[in-house]
C-alpha cells in the first residue's frame, strides 16, 4: 500500500493511493482428485489485484464547502482451475479485468456543528480469493466470475457538538441508493457444492443512522442501525434466475439490523499511569428469508431467525502505553446465531488478546 499527499496552495490538495495484493496457491488437493479425477492444484493458482486512486480535495466559501473529485482504476488477473457447474474440470484458465471508477463528493457546513453532504460514485468490487478459488471443500472455483459494478448515490446530514460542550454528541443519518450489475452471489449447485456466480442485477435503497454520546468524560455510548431493501432489477444472461422474480427482494440478505454499546474508562484519580476499561455491545439482526419471498407461503419458508447477541469485556493498558491485554466474552447468553444460508455460528465464546505496540 502506498499513499501520497501533495498540497496545492491553501485550498486544494491532491492524494494518490495504490493498493496491491498478490496470492498464490500451491499444493496437492486429494479431495479434488477424488471429485474431479484431476488435481485442481496440479498447476499453481494465482490472483493479483491492484487499485489506484487519485483525488482532488478543494475548499471554497471560507472552507464551508468541500468538494472531493476522485478517479479510480481497478485491475485483476487470475489463474484458476476451470471447473464447470456440473463439476467437470476443464483445465486452467486465465482471466483479467481492467475497469475504471470515478466519483464526486460534496459537503457544506451550514453551521459550525451541522453539515450536509451528497456524493455519487461509479465503483467496482473485484472478486476476492474465496469467490474465485472457492474453499476447496464445499465451494468450488469459478474461473469466469466478473467484478461487480455499481452506481452509488448517498445523501446525509451530520451534527457534532462543539469542542467546548460538556456532553459531546455526534449524530449522523444517511440515505443511499445503489444500482449494481454482475452482483456476486453464492449459488447452490447441489446438496454438497456451491459456487460464487454473477447472478443478479439489483437496486438497493436504504437508510443508516448513528449516534455517539459521552455523558461523562470516561463514558461513551453509541447506537447505530440500518435498513436496506435490495430488489432484483433484471435477470442474468444465463437464465439461472427466472424473470418472475424481477421486483422481488433478494433472499438470504439481512435487511434490518442495529448495534449499541458503551465503553467506560476508570477515572485517572483511580488509576494513575495505566488504564482499565470496560465495554459492552449488543447486536440485533431481524429475521430474513433464505429463499425468494414470492415463492409459496411465508410460514413454510426457511428463515434465518431474529438474533440478539450480548458481548462484554475488559481491557488493561500497561504503563508506557505499548502493551495492552483484553478479555472478551461474546454471546454471553449463548443465543443461537446464524450466518447467511442458515449456517450456525459459535455460541458463547471467550477471547484473550495481547497487543504490543512497537516504535514510538
Identify the role of each PLM range.
Residues 1-93, 97-112, 119-121, 163-177, ...:
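Face-selective signature of the C-terminal outer-membrane beta-barrel domain
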Amino acid at each position: 500500500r502506498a499513499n501520497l499527499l501533495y498540497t496545492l496552495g491553501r485550498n486544494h490538495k491532491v492524494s494518490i493511493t495504490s493498493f496491491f495484493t498478490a496470492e498464490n496457491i500451491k499444493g496437492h488437493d486429494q479431495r479434488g482428485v477424488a471429485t474431479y479425477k484431476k488435481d485442481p492444484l496440479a498447476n499453481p493458482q494465482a490472483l493479483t489485484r491492484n487499485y489506484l486512486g487519485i483525488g482532488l480535495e478543494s475548499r471554497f466559501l471560507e472552507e464551508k464547502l468541500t468538494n472531493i473529485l476522485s478517479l479510480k482504476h481497478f485491475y485483476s488477473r487470475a489463474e484458476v482451475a476451470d471447473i464447470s457447474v456440473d463439476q467437470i474440470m476443464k483445465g486452467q484458465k486465465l482471466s483479467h479485468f481492467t475497469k475504471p471508477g470515478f466519483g464526486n463528493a460534496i459537503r457544506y457546513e451550514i453551521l459550525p456543528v451541522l453539515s450536509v453532504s451528497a456524493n455519487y460514485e461509479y465503483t467496482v468490487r473485484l472478486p476476492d480469493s474465496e469467490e474465485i478459488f472457492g474453499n476447496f471443500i464445499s465451494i468450488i472455483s469459478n474461473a469466469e466470475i466478473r467484478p461487480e459494478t455499481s452506481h452509488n448515490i448517498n445523501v446525509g446530514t451530520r451534527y457534532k457538538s462543539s469542542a467546548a460542550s460538556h456532553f459531546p454528541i455526534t449524530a449522523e443519518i444517511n440515505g443511499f441508493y445503489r444500482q449494481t450489475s454482475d452482483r456476486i452471489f453464492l449459488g447452490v449447485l447441489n446438496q454438497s457444492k456451491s459456487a460464487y456466480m454473477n447472478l443478479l442485477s439489483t437496486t438497493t435503497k436504504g437508510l443508516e443512522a448513528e449516534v455517539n454520546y459521552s455523558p461523562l468524560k470516561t463514558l461513551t455510548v453509541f447506537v447505530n442501525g440500518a435498513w436496506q431493501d435490495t430488489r432484483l432489477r433484471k435477470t442474468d444472461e444465463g437464465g439461472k434466475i427466472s424473470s418472475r422474480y424481477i421486483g422481488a427482494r433478494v433472499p438470504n440478505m439481512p435487511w434490518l439490523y442495529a448495534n449499541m454499546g458503551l465503553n467506560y474508562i476508570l477515572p485517572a484519580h483511580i488509576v494513575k499511569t495505566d488504564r482499565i476499561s470496560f465495554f459492552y455491545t449488543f447486536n440485533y439482526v431481524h429475521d430474513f428469508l433464505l429463499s425468494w419471498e414470492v415463492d409459496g407461503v411465508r410460514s413454510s419458508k426457511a428463515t434465518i431467525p431474529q438474533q440478539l447477541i450480548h458481548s462484554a469485556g475488559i481491557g488493561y493498558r500497561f504503563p508506557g502505553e505499548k502493551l495492552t491485554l483484553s478479555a472478551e466474552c461474546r454471546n454471553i447468553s449463548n443465543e443461537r446465531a446464524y450466518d447467511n444460508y442458515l449456517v450456525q455460528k459459535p455460541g458463547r465464546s471467550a477471547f484473550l488478546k495481547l497487543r504490543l505496540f512497537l516504535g514510538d
